[in-house]
């Protein structure tokens, strides 16, 4: 108890002297003199902190009476500020408070509610507590109270937090569902709006032509599905409401003229339709460059060009379609190519004008991309149709001319007789002029050109087509070059090194009938150079240079040369010996997985089977080369080679001496007495001096058709006539025996027989074979396996010993180092 009492005793600080302002303080002369003399002693005065001294002095502990008086004064000031908002409490209910002066003070209450009163009391207490300076004990009590309140608050929190956590995901899910529902509703509303606008336009386009603007505004939506639906619906609307003629907007003079209401209505309809169609095309061209709308935009452009090729802005449509004719996207490329083919085959819709424009655009496209396009870009030319008898006059025109001449004679006779006929003549002239004007207007609307105009357009298209073909040939010759070593190796393009050469050669073979004979010589020289481009090049340079022509492309060049000669009825004086030499060398360079067998079979048919006049030495060389070729490759290649070999032997009777082994071929060899298998020229091979020994091997082929064909060829006699030619061509043989159509299954010689038949059919050698002792056989196998196991174990032990021997010196070195580190003497010696 004594200790507690001692702690409760508080020693008040001494009273401070009265505050005096610095201005009122007076200093004597002696004080100033003393300070000047002893400045060192007066320096501490400058370092005194008056604020800290005042704080320490003001931090004395207040008594209970002082606190009470201070609180009462503050409450009094608050009551005075509130004014008349308080009422006096009954003195019976509440005891008064007596101050030191002896005055009684009764309690008053405000007119507010109890909650407001509690809030004000708490606020007042907080203000008072903040203003008072607390002791350490009071601070501790306050901290303890705050901790207790915090603990109570923590106990109450978890339930509320769990409720909030449960409520938040539900709210988020509900918000997401609402958003999805709103998005679906907006999507359905927009779809219905598009359908309504489209139905209005289709039902009455003249009255509802303004709704096209609303449909075009829907194309600006952020939803891609809505934009696609709007584009497709606009496509259907434009296909239906576009007229069958080209719209011509009125000029300034025509606008100044007075017109009827119907004409105004049609003009307004046509102008709004043209504006909407133009803006629609602009949107399609913009969407075409975006990957999301690429296919939809190209589909709309292609369908519009097919449906309304006569309408306005067809040039813009054609440019957009030709631009994507070699697109890397296969769907877009097929759409554009099919549209161009449709335009070429249906010239009645546009009068042939779009064909000329399309061919020119394709030619410029090929030139701009340096002939590095997809083959489909040139294959569309195969759909063009050229009229051969376009310049010949019709019978009706001749009949009309004769009728006009007779009429002229009659009119001249009548003029001399009657003067009144002059008036009739003037009327007839006026009628003829009017008819000519009407026919001219009709031509301008229907786009039906005359024979001269049509012939002119077709000559322009033909010149553009052959211009592209010759450009491709020159480009391939430039890339290959006269010496391939001069050209640096470079990677081929996305579509190959020469993607346009194959369709170019096919087009030349088809359209050479329309080509002038003056250009035939240049064409044959180009083909000859291309066919012999890789013949003088070594294998190393062929592998390094990827721009050399393949075997299939060189065979195509030979084929086109023969087709050009056939189409012109052999009117050209061109030697085809070089092409035979290339075919003779290309037969051995052929590889089935790399090259096309169809082209090889076609070249064998056209160059060897269909050729009427052949040299005996050359025919024998091809017979020998084809027999060697049949041994090296599959069924389809060997069958087509045997069919060609048979036709050559049937046509050339002297070449059948190759089938006779007794003759030896020496007497029929001619100038060359020995066969040269590595000769590049068939005329210098000396094939008549050899024998077809390959047929004896082919007669034992696993395929029965090839073996039978080889036996029939080997059994041919020299006395057989040439009338019994084979009905099967090399192309048919290759197609029938290719892997795709071949259904051949080699027969299994093992027959399913009964046990009795097996015993009876066994030969005597099989019966005399002794039975095998399985026990001895198993012992031998076990010994063999044990030997192998021992060998593996020995190898493993050897490897372990070697590793252990390598580790021993390392361990010794480590031990020596450790000893030296432990002994300090050894360190000094080191």
UniProtKB/Swiss-Prot annotation:
Keywords: Coiled coil, DNA replication, Nucleus, Ribosome biogenesis
Role this protein plays: May be required for synthesis of 60S ribosomal subunits and the transport of pre-ribosomes from the nucleoplasm to the cytoplasm. Also required for initiation of DNA replication.
Recorded name of the encoding gene: NOC3
Biased composition (Acidic residues): 118-129, 159-168
Name of this chain's protein: Nucleolar complex-associated protein 3
Family membership: Belongs to the CBF/MAK21 family.
Biased composition (Basic and acidic residues): 67-84, 130-140, 391-400, 420-436
GO cellular component: nucleolus; nucleoplasm
Residues spanned by motif Nuclear localization signal 1: 138-145
Subunit and partners: Component of nucleolar complexes. Interacts with RBL and NOC2 in both the nucleolus and nucleoplasm.
Main localization of the protein described in the UniProt heading: nucleus
Cellular location(s): Nucleus; Nucleus, Nucleolus; Nucleus, Nucleoplasm
Residue positions of motif Nuclear localization signal 2: 408-415
Location of the region described as Disordered in the Swiss-Prot/TrEMBL record: 1-22, 67-86, 112-169, 391-436, 802-830
Alphabetical GO biological process terms: DNA replication; ribosome biogenesis
């Amino acid at each position: 108890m004594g200790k507690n009492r001692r702690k409760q005793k508080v020693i008040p600080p001494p009273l401070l002297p009265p505050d005096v302002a610095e201005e009122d303080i007076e200093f004597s002369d002696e004080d100033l003199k003393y300070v000047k003399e002893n400045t060192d002693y007066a320096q501490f005065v400058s370092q005194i902190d008056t604020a800290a001294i005042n704080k320490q002095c003001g931090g004395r502990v207040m008594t209970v009476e002082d606190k009470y008086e201070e609180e009462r004064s503050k409450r009094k000031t608050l009551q005075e500020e509130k004014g008349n908002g308080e009422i006096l409490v009954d003195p019976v209910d509440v005891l008064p408070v007596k101050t030191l002066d002896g005055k009684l003070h009764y309690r008053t209450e405000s007119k507010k509610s109890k909650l407001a009163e509690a809030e004000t009391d708490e606020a007042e207490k907080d203000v008072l507590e903040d203003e008072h300076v607390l002791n350490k004990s009071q601070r501790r009590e306050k901290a303890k109270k705050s901790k207790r309140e915090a603990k109570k608050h923590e106990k109450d929190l978890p339930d509320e937090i769990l409720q909030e956590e449960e409520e938040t995901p539900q709210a988020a899910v509900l918000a997401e569902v609402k958003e999805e529902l709103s998005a679906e509703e907006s999507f359905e509303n927009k779809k219905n709006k598009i359908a309504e606008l489209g139905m209005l336009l289709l039902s009455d386009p003249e009255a509802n032509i303004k709704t096209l603007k609303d449909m075009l505004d829907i194309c600006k939506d952020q939803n891609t599905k809505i934009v696609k639906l709007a584009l497709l619906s606009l496509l259907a609307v434009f296909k239906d409401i576009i007229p069958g003629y080209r719209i011509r907007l009125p000029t300034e003079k025509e606008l100044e003229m007075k017109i009827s209401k119907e004409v105004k209505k049609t003009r307004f309809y046509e102008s709004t339709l043209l504006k909407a169609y133009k803006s629609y095309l602009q949107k399609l061209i913009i969407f075409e460059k975006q990957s999301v709308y690429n296919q939809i935009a190209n589909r709309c452009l292609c369908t519009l060009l097919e449906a309304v090729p006569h309408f306005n802005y067809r040039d813009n449509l054609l440019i957009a379609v030709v631009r994507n004719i070699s697109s890397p996207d296969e769907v877009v490329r097929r759409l554009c190519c099919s549209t161009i083919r449709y335009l070429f085959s249906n010239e009645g819709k546009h009068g042939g004008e779009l064909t000329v424009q399309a061919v020119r655009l394709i030619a410029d496209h090929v030139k701009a991309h340096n002939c590095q396009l997809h083959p489909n870009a040139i294959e569309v030319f195969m759909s063009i149709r050229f009229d051969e008898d376009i310049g010949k006059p019709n019978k009706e025109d001749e009949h009309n001319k004769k009728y006009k001449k007779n009429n002229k004679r009659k009119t001249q006779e009548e003029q001399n007789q009657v003067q009144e006929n002059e008036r009739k003549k003037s009327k007839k002239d006026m009628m003829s002029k009017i008819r000519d004007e009407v026919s001219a207007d009709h031509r301008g609307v229907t786009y039906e050109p005359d024979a001269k105009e049509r012939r002119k357009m077709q000559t322009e298209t033909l010149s553009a087509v052959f211009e592209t073909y010759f450009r491709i040939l020159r480009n391939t010759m430039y890339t290959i070059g006269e010496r391939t070593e001069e050209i640096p190796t470079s990677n081929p393009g996305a579509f190959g090194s020469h993607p346009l050469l194959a369709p170019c050669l096919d087009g030349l073979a088809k359209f050479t009938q329309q080509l002038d004979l003056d250009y035939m010589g240049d064409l044959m020289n180009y083909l000859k150079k291309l066919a012999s481009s890789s013949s003088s090049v070594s294998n190393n340079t062929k592998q390094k240079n990827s721009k050399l022509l393949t075997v299939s492309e060189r065979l195509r060049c030979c084929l086109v040369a023969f087709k050009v000669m056939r189409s012109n009825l052999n009117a050209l004086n061109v030697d085809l010996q070089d092409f035979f030499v290339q075919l003779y060398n290309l037969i051995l360079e052929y590889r089935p997985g790399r090259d096309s067998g169809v082209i090889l079979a076609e070249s064998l048919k056209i160059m060897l089977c269909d050729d009427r006049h052949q040299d005996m030495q050359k025919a024998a060389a091809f017979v020998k080369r084809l027999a060697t070729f049949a041994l090296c490759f599959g069924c389809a290649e060997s069958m087509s080679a045997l069919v060609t070999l048979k036709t050559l032997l049937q046509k050339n009777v002297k070449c059948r001496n190759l089938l006779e082994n007794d003759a030896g071929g020496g007497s029929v060899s001619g100038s060359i007495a020995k066969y040269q298998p590595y000769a590049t020229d068939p005329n210098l091979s000396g094939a008549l001096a050899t024998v077809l020994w390959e047929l004896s091997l082919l007669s034992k082929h696993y395929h029965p058709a090839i073996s039978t064909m080889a036996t029939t060829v080997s059994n041919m006699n020299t006395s057989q006539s040439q009338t019994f030619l084979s009905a099967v061509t090399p192309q048919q043989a290759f197609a029938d025996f290719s892997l795709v159509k071949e259904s051949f299954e080699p027969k299994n010689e093992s027959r399913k027989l009964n046990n009795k038949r097996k015993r009876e059919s066994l030969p005597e050698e099989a019966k005399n074979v002794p039975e095998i002792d399985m026990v001895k056989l198993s012992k031998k196998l076990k010994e063999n396996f044990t030997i192998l196991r021992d060998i593996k174990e020995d190898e493993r032990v050897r490897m372990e010993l070697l590793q252990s021997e390598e580790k021993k010196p390392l361990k010794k070195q480590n031990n020596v180092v450790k000893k030296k580190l432990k002994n300090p003497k050894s360190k000094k010696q080191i």
